[in-house]
């Protein structure tokens, strides 16, 4: 055929090299069959065309996978999906390996606390007493101060020097003087410890989160708390150790001398019973200061600790702010013998 020879010389060349039939021969036919008479070149060209067509279609369908088969037989996968070992032993190196089973988070080693404990705090130093102040007139002792120190905020508990701001014995009996001496600490992140002594010798007070100052409303934070400290006398010796052959057991009394002078304030830390009353969360009546009074804690018309302007009388009742018991053994009302105010972190 002239079509194949004129359009593609290369195909004609391949055809001539692949098939070279004898020009004098004709294809065999069965008896009785009608055989068309065609030339050998036309027969070879049509055979090559059919082989080329069917061969191309066969290669196309066998080389490219069917989209419908691949999507139906295989589940969808994410290229960046991560799967873990179901036994929890995946250490991060088996990411991308899909497994069957319930997902279990990878196992990590638990952190072990350091055997090294916190460093011990330095002993407190109470600074500010004048040389003329007698030892028995000092209210806050190192033993009581250490108990209060355990409850103040951490940023202040590491401070090992407390400074005396006001002392009734050194500065006189005046609440206005106390306010004046506190003005220099306005705007600073400091804390205050208030200590009071009643006429029976009881020591109690409060921790103040803010500077005491005259204000129309309550102020302060939940860091405030009330406290009281009482000296515990040692137990008397048993009767078997007392040589009293002629003394009857009924009505016996024993006087025990303390190991140290309690009036001087120098007592053993183990002989002090310290009790604190932290913030209860009921209300926010932490501090309220006026010209005629200073109070800490309130609720239902009662004050946890209240002092008058002359620092001569005080009141201590159960209040909702701290849920405390009365701080003075004298009752809700007591007389004042001493007042001290200490600053921490100045």
Swiss-Prot record:
Belongs to the OXR1 family. Residues 138-345 form the TLDc domain. GO terms for cellular component: mitochondrion; nucleus. It holds the Pfam family TLD. May be involved in protection from oxidative damage. One of its GO terms (biological process) is response to oxidative stress. Keywords: Mitochondrion. It comes from Podospora anserina. Residues 1-42, 64-108 are annotated as: Disordered. Residues 1-19, 64-76 have a biased composition (Polar residues). Residues 20-31 have a biased composition (Low complexity). It comes from the Eukaryota. It is found in: Mitochondrion. InterPro entries: TLDc_dom (IPR006571). This is Oxidation resistance protein 1. The lineage of its organism: Eukaryota, Fungi, Dikarya, Ascomycota, Pezizomycotina.
């Amino acid at each position: 055929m002239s079509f194949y020879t004129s359009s593609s010389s290369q195909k004609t060349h391949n055809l001539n090299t692949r098939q070279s039939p004898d020009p004098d021969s004709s294809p065999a036919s069965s008896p009785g069959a009608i055989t068309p008479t065609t030339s050998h070149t036309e027969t070879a060209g049509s055979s090559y065309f059919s082989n080329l067509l069917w061969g191309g279609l066969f290669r196309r369908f066998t080389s490219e996978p069917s989209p419908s088969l691949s999507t139906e037989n295989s589940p969808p996968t994410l290229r960046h999906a991560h799967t873990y070992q179901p036994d929890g032993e995946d250490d991060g190196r088996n990411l991308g390996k899909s497994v069957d089973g319930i997902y279990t988070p990878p196992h990590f080693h638990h952190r072990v606390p350091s055997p090294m404990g916190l460093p011990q705090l330095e002993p407190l130093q109470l600074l500010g007493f004048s040389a003329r102040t007698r030892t028995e007139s000092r209210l806050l002792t190192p033993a009581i101060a250490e108990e209060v120190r355990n409850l103040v905020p951490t940023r202040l508990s590491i401070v090992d020097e407390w400074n005396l701001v006001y002392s009734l014995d050194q500065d006189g009996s005046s609440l206005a003087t106390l306010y004046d001496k506190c003005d220099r600490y306005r705007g600073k992140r400091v804390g205050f410890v208030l200590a009071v002594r009643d006429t029976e010798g009881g020591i109690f007070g409060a921790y103040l989160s803010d500077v005491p100052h005259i204000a129309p409303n309550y102020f302060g934070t939940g860091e405030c708390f009330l406290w009281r400290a009482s000296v515990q006398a040692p137990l008397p010796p048993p009767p078997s150790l007392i040589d009293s052959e002629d003394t009857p057991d009924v009505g016996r009394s024993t006087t025990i001398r303390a190991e140290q002078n309690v009036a001087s304030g120098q007592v053993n830390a183990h002989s002090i019973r310290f009790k604190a009353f932290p913030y209860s969360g009921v209300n926010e009546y932490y501090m309220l200061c006026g010209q005629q009074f200073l109070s800490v804690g309130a609720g239902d018309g009662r004050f946890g600790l209240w002092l008058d302007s002359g620092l001569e009388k005080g009141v201590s009742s159960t209040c909702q702010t701290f849920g405390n018991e009365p701080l003075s053994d004298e009752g809700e009302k007591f007389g004042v013998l001493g007042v001290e105010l200490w600053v921490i972190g100045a």
